[in-house]
Amino acid sequence: MVETDSMRALGILAEASRVISEGEVLQLTRAHDLNLDQATYLQIISAKTAELFAAAAEAGAVGAGADPSAIKALRDYGMALGIAFQLADDALDYGATAEALGKNAGDDFNEGKATLPLLLAVARTRGREEAFWERTVTKGERTPEDFTRARELIIGSGAIGATLDLSLIHI
């Protein structure tokens, strides 16, 4: 019985590795893309962070001998929690200080990742800031001061609050 559950848990983790890899490839192919839509962004974070949370919850339930309905419920919970976590993490990358984060603020911006706060701010400032976004995100031509400006535009556009609101829907 334990061996069967262990093999099932390994299968869950192997499948999660496949999905996460596909999510990473999708994110890499859409890096620097200011036209990334919200549905694709959510697909990326579902395939990466949320899949990891879901697989951990599901494998734990399998290992504990939970019944199929509990296993499914825990997997669904892990998926929702993973989406909420990643949305909040993406918002905090622009809305918090490095001290509060425990890591560098602005890493997503500096890596050219099209996260939801950035995408919302781009859409909300489209006409007047298009050249800035094109230079810093699409072309990757950033100065040390550009993160400060991007942060101001993102916060000023309400993108942080909108991203956190979406995060709360998933909890």
Q: What is the predicted function of each stretch?
A:
Residues M1-I169:
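All-alpha prenyltransferase/terpene-synthase fold signal
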